Structures are given as structure tokens and as C-alpha cells.
Amino acid sequence: MAVFALSPIVHLTVRVFEGGTGAAFSLLFRQRTLDLAVRTLVLTLVVALGCLIVGVLAAWLVTRTDLPGRRFFAVALAAPLAIPSYVAAYVWIAEFPVLAGLPGAALVLIASCFPLVMLPVAAAFASADPGVSEVSRTLGRNAFRTAWTVEARGVVPAAAAGTLLASLYTISDFGAVALMRYDAFTLGVYSAYRGGLDRTVAAVLGLVLVVIATVLTLLERRLRRGATARTGSGVSRVAEPIPLRRWVVPAWSVVLAVLTVSVLVPMLGLVRWMIHSLRFTIAWRDVLTAMLTTIQYATAAAVVVVVLAVPVAVYVARTSSPVGRAAETAVYIAHGLPGITVGLAVVFFGIRFLPAFYQTAVLLIVAYAVLFLPLAVGPARAAIVSTSAAVDDVSRTLGSGPARTDRRVTLPLALPGIAAGAALVFLTVAKELPATLMLRPRGADTLATELWSATQVLKYGEAAPYALALVLVSVVPTIVLDRAVRRRSVPVREAPVEVAS
């Protein structure tokens, strides 16, 4: 799989050196490239911090507390993944033009990406054994201090993986930064590809994105180094939810504020477009066809990516070999590239080595696998790391080999993380645009491509049915994800946990 992940980098390298080494270095060190790098890094840092704070807090509230309506909020807080960032950006910039620039781009991307942190962290909270927290409380620490000093350490791998995904999404996003008029690397790449026949500028900028993605991946690996779960009994159970008591109203305020920014405002904009579209004849047959095509592609991609991701996740979670680290790094680097770069690489290799599959769903699924494999690897690896090592040891002492132990013990315990990855892949594929536009079979339009086509010609009323259908498509996987997480969250009866006054 690392070979597929590295194919866009190979393509970029070939393009860069086609123009000569001197020309490539002159483009690399010009002021324009430096400005784009600084602006991209600033945006990425702001979005990463915002997603980390909002995602971890939201996951803790819906999995570890008695927040009223937490089951509904667990599903609702994943809904932003179904709303394309470029749709949310348009709604916000139309209503609040003053947000143009860094504030608007950061707001939209945090609102769109924090579920990438929340979902794996929620799965990690749900899978964690409460034994360590119980010991902390017997030593006199209250619930909040235990959550901050003990439970937070257990979700470091999941939080780091989710933050990495949010960061990579940020450096590869085009629609939101373009609509918010924030000049970042992706805008430079797209402008270079569109501006002429010489693709060297775009390739050089793409390679800089590779460097940034590599740095982010190595930083994430360092943050989660040594963060493994160690429990004694290996009994699968979850502690009684923490009573919020007088903190219920502040907790509700936080959750509702997040939902307002990430879901309510974009949805109100879509509803207004939908009302406007009623003046025209809506081609419901086209909407239904695009919906079915989207479901088919997203389902196929989710299955393929999970099948590829689970062995990678098991390997990198259980070993620290250079081969495993290199494979994981390659997988994450590809996720930081713009979809058009990956699409062009797949076209490049497809025409030369797999011409029979050009403009078929096969190459499209390959592109999805290259782009979105980290969405499944990260949560699955974090869930595997958080499972009890003692359980694996007991299984092996009873005669089970490593493969059988992984199949019968580790993977079932890691199911919430694997389900989180599958849901993330499904939701992200459903709204993927550049790669789908380039590689889809002729006439096979998805909800995202139809939505983009309508918004490109400012027909926002006609775009509304496709946007709302895209949100509808996301409901089922988010519900499945919520149930998978809650299967690991059924509380056992323990002594009530008191919150410090």
C-alpha cells in the first residue's frame, strides 16, 4: 500500500525535474513560495489547536459524563463531516463578509474537522478500561482532575491521530480557503495547474506540501510515542458516567455553540437555498441517481480502505520497526496532498500501466484509497494501542498465535476504532470533489460533483437538493458509528463519582 501512497510523490518529482534542477530551486526559494508556506502553517496551527480542544472536550462530554441528550449529541456532533467545507464557507462568507481571510478559513475548517478528533477520541474513551481511573480516585483525586491527569493520557494516540488528520485536511483543502480568500498553498497549486501548460510551479508547490505533511506526521508520532494502555485484568467495562451536576448548563452551552457554528448556520443557509429552488423544477431523478452513485462509491471505498488499513494499523501498533514507520509515514503524507495532485498521479500511472482501467471506478477507488487510508489507519491503530496488552498475553499463553490473537481478541476489542475509521472514510468520500471530478467514469456524477457544478455557476437554489441529500446520506454511517462506540460504553454499576464543588 505504501507504493500506491508514494505514487503522487513520484509523479511530482518527475514533473519538477522535467523543468531542470535550476528552475526548480529558483521556484522553491522565491518569496511567493515562502509567503504561501507561512500562511499555510499559520492556518494549520490554528485549526489543529481548535480541533484538538473542541474534539477532545466534545468526546469527553458525550462518552464520559451524564450530559442530558449525550447519545443524540454523539451523532449530531459528527454531522459536520457531511457538510462540504466549501458549502459551509459560502454560507458563512455570504452572511458575514467580515470573516474573509484567516478568521473565516480557520472557523470553517475547525467546524468541519473537529469530528476527525472527536470520533477516534470518543472510541478511545469508550474502549478504555476504568481501572486506572479508579486507582486515581482512590488516591483522592476528583473526577475532573482524574480526567485531566489520567484519562487524557489514555487518549493521546487517538487525539494525536485525529489532530494529524485535521492538519492534513487543512493543508490540502481548496474550497474553503478559496471562498474565504485566504491565499494558502492549495490555492497556489490549483492556480498553477489552471494557469498554463507548464506544471512545474504546481509540482514544486506540491512537493513543499509533501515536506509539510512529513513534518506533521513525524510530530504526531513523537507525541504518541510510548502512549500505550496497560491494565491488569483486561475486563471490558466502562465506569459509571461522571455526574456534571451544576456544570450541566455550561456543558450544554458549549455543545450547542459548537453545533450552531458547525451545523445550524450551514443548514439554515441550505434550507434557504432549498426554498429558493422551489421556484424552479427540481430534477429529482438526477438527485436520486447522484445519491445512489455516491453511496456506491463511498461504500466500496470504505470497504477497500478498511481492508487495507487494518493490517497496517495492527503492524504499526505492535512494532516500531523502520519499515512500519516508513509505511505509516508514506500513508499520511499522501493524505496531505490536494485531491487534484493525487488525481493527476493516478491518471499518470493509470494511462501508462493500467490503460484498460482508465476512466473506470477502479482507478477512482485507488485514488480514494491513497487519499483516505489514514482516516481508517489512525482510529484503528489508536484503538489497538488502547486495548489491554494483558489480554493479548493471556491469549498467547493459552496457545493462540499472534494472527489468531489479533483476529479473535485484539480486533473485536478495537471494533469502535475500526468503525470510526470506516465512517470517516464513507463520509469523506461522499463529499470528495477534485479526485472525483477527474477520475469518475463518464456520466457517473456524485452529489458532490453535482453540487459543485451548480455552485460554480451561482445556481445555489439548484445546489440545495444535492447538498441536503449529501447530509441525508451521512446519517446512516454516523448512527452506525454511534452504536459501535456505545456498545463499548455500557456502564457497569459502580460507586457514583462526585464532581468537586
Residue ranges of predicted features:
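Glycine-rich helix-loop "coupling/hinge" segments at transmembrane-helix boundaries
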Residues: 171-197, 431-460, 493-498
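Membrane-helix/interface signature in polytopic inner-membrane proteins
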Residues: 122-133, 143, 381-392
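Polytopic alpha-helical membrane proteins, predominantly small-molecule transporters/carriers
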Residues: 37, 140-141, 149-151
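Membrane-water interface segments at the C-terminal ends of transmembrane alpha-helices
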Residues: 1-19, 29-126, 154-174, 202-221, ...
